[in-house]
Amino acid sequence: MCNIAGYTGNRQAAPILIDMMRREEGYWGGYYTGIATIDNGRVYHAKVVGDVETLVRETDALRLPGTTGIIHSRTPSGGDREWAYPFVSCDGKVAFVENGIIGSFEKTTDFPAAAMDLKKKGHKLSSCTTDEIKGYPRLPDGTSVHYSEVQCHLLEELLYSGLQPLEAMRELLRRWPCEDVGVAIHHAHPNKIFAARFNQPMTLARAKGEAFISTTPLAFPEQDFIGVDVLPANACYEISANGLSVINAIDPAVRVCPITPAVFVQALQDVTAKLQAAKEPVPFSVVAETCKFPQGGIPQMALLGYLVLESLLKSGKVVQTTIRKDGMTAGLTAPVFMISWK
């Protein structure tokens, strides 16, 4: 799983994005991290194996120009720097990040076939490796590839076909669905962020002349907001500093389990019991797994977990601390936020 943040507004995006990622990478990130911004019709990006501090130390991430951008950090898997987000299209016009899994669409979403088709069309997939990476597509030519990079290049093809970015994002998830949320920026739209959300979490906060998105509201800066909202599931969004365009129902046939007041109360009770019974602090993944219900559709356990955790932190009933675990390579460590009952 992963953490994502985005910003568009009237300030330099990079420092804001880095601050937001520091606030959330310990939930489900810290092993691969990257950032992308737009300025003067050009997409800039930087990425590393490591956490956000590694990104700042080893790249010019803090100095990337532009007032619109996205940032991403994720859990360990395998692969080198090319397995970090963002993924960038061959023409350099699109940067794409994603959070999620193929999940229940594994039998219908054929990323190996899509990847081979892209290769035939001349696309260069930089994440291709002869190493076998567990949980990621293995291609007929014996290589493994990050399916999110395949998504990025499929998005590029959809844009070449004449679709506008918002429509292209919808078509991407409609034709190659995953249990995920995808976010993109496009060089020709320097003041917009495009998102397509099936079930993984995405929240939106607004201030005067600014819009922020994040995996969890716990990542938002400490400032006054006009409003903070969860972006509804199974929909696509064009986000600007002063507006929001929506395409509902990426796929009307897909049912995402709603988070009703009753579901939230049950999750709050279950997480409370889990934390009270725990003999030592637990990572956020334990909170999220406790929220893996109801049945009968695609769950929103990550979003539900973040909403419950936010409630518990605000009430002062839990404490969040940070430990560091071994990173992807020797000498690197990753932050992990640990939750405990007071």
Region locations from a protein language model:
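Conserved short alpha-helical segments that host acidic/polar catalytic motifs at enzyme active sites
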Residues: 1-342
